[in-house]
């Protein structure tokens, strides 16, 4: 029997669902199987097992006869580890189930390598990727209020000029970093002063991955378009709002 963390019989409220429900939530079958196998059985301190290891090591006689507790956090952790471990080709196939096809995207490897480090489910993986690929339709109000200041427009325009001069070299993270770090030092900026307004302009929020990665994935034309849009529209409106509040 599987109990909830309080020791009572597991119900749907606690996480007891149909297998397809887990699929729809973005869990990989290997992670779910690993989780179920470990509920009443162990092999020392090992937590993660390949299918081959499960077949080789699992012994029904070693199953614990007492009730086991459902731990949703453990399942999420296992799923995140499997997402990091499986091939990018496999992740591309999993994402198709959620209507995202990266098969022919020129930066699919970079997108997946970056996003799978943060995702606990395939649903989260999709969101992390689309946050980068989709042009933002709104901007995080709290982030704009905190990081967009009166001088933000000036140094973002300077930074855009720098990117344009080096636009042929923005194809990898190392080049973007090499171009950006001297700019930050020369203009007396702190990293959040530059990076957080850029994150907001490019993705709509402040919790996106590294700015270097995003720029290398999107390329100059898309980065320029999104930054210019943010400067002309949202950031200016925010300054007006703040001035009206003063």
Where are these regions (language model features)?
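Amphipathic alpha-helical segments within well-ordered protein domains
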Residues: 19-20, 33, 76-79, 96, ...
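Charged substrate- and nucleic-acid-binding regions of tRNA-handling and nucleotidyl-transfer enzymes
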Residues: 171-234, 242
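Small-residue-rich helix-loop
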Residues: 88-187
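Short, mixed-charge aromatic SLiMs
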Residues: 5-8, 56-64, 102, 139-144, ...
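Alpha-helical recognition segments enriched in aromatics with Gly/Pro capping
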Residues: 1-82, 196-202, 206, 229-230
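Eukaryotic N-terminal low-complexity, Ser/Thr- and Lys/Arg-rich leader segments
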Residues: 239-246
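Hard-cation-handling environments
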Residues: 85
